Each structure stands twice: as structure tokens, then as C-alpha cells.
Amino acid sequence: MWLVAHPASQGSYWTVVTAEGSATRWQVYDGTVSDKTILQQQAPGRPPVVTSGESEPRLLDHPSIMSRNAGQMMASGEGTSRRMFVATNGDLVIAGDDRFRLPIDAPTDARPAAIGNGTYVVYGDVTGRYQHGALGDTLEPSSLVVVNPTNAEVIARTVLDPPLVFEGLQPLVADLDGDGEPEIVTTIADSENGARIAVYSPAGERIATGPVYGPGWRHQLAAAPFGPDDTTELAVVLKPHVTHTLEYYRLADGDLSVRAPVDGISSHTYGSRNLDGAVAADLDADGTVELLVPTTDRRRLVAVSRTSSDARIQWEWELGGQLTSNLTGVGLDDGGVAVGAATANDVFVWST
């Protein structure tokens, strides 16, 4: 199941897409659910994308040439919006007034991410040389591709040497070191050493690499001012299917180090393409950013926050069943936050 949250004039809108593709939209305000709207049937497996502006939110359709498991996003530049997605043959499609295709040989489940200044990053050059299969299949990307959709051009392409691959569907973009410039956060892996976090510049240059603990995945979740001094840190789950350890990384002077761990966290289900397993926000209006993540049994959500010396679970929400959706949220007009999650039988929305 997928949830998409978006702002409303009062409260928030929630688009709910079931595993079978049935889609509905609801408005949640002041503890009341209203305005149910039935939306067009969606292709199962694809993450839904909702556009909003002055009009009501609109659920984007899926072009016929779009890969079955791909995500899509709207890219803007020079006053024009363009849709970006991966086609069935691995091309990156840029569709606006005109349609362009960039032959980057992307995995068919790859999803672009915005860097800023009109540039975007996506994984490319699919390979079968790493047979882990944690993210839905045994095909992984081996390159990081930076594009400018306005000019429909590739402006940087970083290719990993064998046996390395990128193990992920979408890079994470954030200013990790506080210099005002974005970094591109990825997970790289090989069959001998396992996975580790690798950070790149928008030009595709490797800036830093995190520690390696042996075979197993690293699930990059969010970057936010988690640090006790409000320093930006990166939240990552070490081996979410085995070790279940949340780690906070900090990038400083080219060094990427782990500052605090918390056990008992499972942000991903093995084989799933749903990687949206956390929300970072001030969830209880205490002035501190918490990370909301599932526990190992995926029947509870816990809020983790950093202290001066470690990280701790501050409070939890019981779900009454196993989590079956992504976690997502939206800022409210009153300064609060609405967060949503779903089990097989219920959709929950909490507002602060």
C-alpha cells in the first residue's frame, strides 16, 4: 500500500493506493475524515505521484512507455514543467512540450531525485553482477547520472568499477556537511565486502565513504538536524533484515563516521521496492527533530532522537497490525505536522 500526503486549505489530503491499485483521496482535519474521492485505478507496484498547486491535488497517470516499477517526478525549469521517468528499455524520458530520451540504461525501478539549480540525479547502467536481491530483483545500477532536463542532457556520469554496484532505487540529496551545497548520498555494495554509504558531489566525485561491517545492506533514510548541536546527520539502518540497527552518520572534513546507534529498528521488508520507511520531523513540538521508524516486528512506530552522547527511543505508536505501507507526512498551515501509516486493515494519520 502507498500513501501520499499533501497540503489542504484545512488540514491535509491523503491519497491511498492499495496493493491492487485502487486509489482514493481523503481530507483529514481536526480529527475528522471527510471528502472521499475515488481516483483512477493505478498499476500495482508503482509509487503514486500527486501534483498540487492552486487546484485540487491530481494523481498522475502512468505513460504507456513507463517501466512497470519505475517512479516519476515533475521537474521544473525556465517556467516549464516536465515529467521524468524510466522507460521499459532503461531510457530516461523527459516529457514536456517535447519528449526526449536519454539512453542511460537505468534499472526499470529507478527513480530520479532533485539536486537543485535545475539538475536531477538518477541511477543508470544496470548490471546483474551483485545477486543480493534485497530490493525486488537481482539487477542493480552501476552508475550515477546527473541530468539537466531543461536541455535534455547528461552533465555528469560516474561509473563504478566491478564488482561494485549502487544498491538502491533513488539517491538521497542533502547538504550533509553544512557548506550550503548539496551532496548525493548512495549505498554501494559488492559481494565480498557488503554495503557501505558513499557520498558524492553533484559533479559525481566521491567525497567520503562510510564504514563496512561485512555483507548486508545499508538503508539510507533521511538527513536532518538530528545532532545534539543541530548539526545535520544522516540516519541509516544497518542490515534492516538482520541486524536492525539504526545509525546516525556525520560528514565532517571528508570523514563519514557513525555517531550513535539504536537497536530494534526494521525500516524495510526484504524484496520490497518500498524504501520510504521513515519520517524525520519535530513530531511532538519539543523543538527537536525525531526520526519515526518501525520496530523489528513492524507492529509499532518509534520516535528516536539524539542526545549529547547517544540516541534513544522517546515514545512509540502501536499499529495493531504489521505496517504494510510507506511512512510519509506533510507540514500543516498551523506549523504542525501530519504523519501517516497503514496496516492491512487501517490507515492512521497523526497530527501534531
Question: How should each PLM-predicted stretch be described?
Answer:
Residues 1-352:
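Beta-propeller-forming repeat regions
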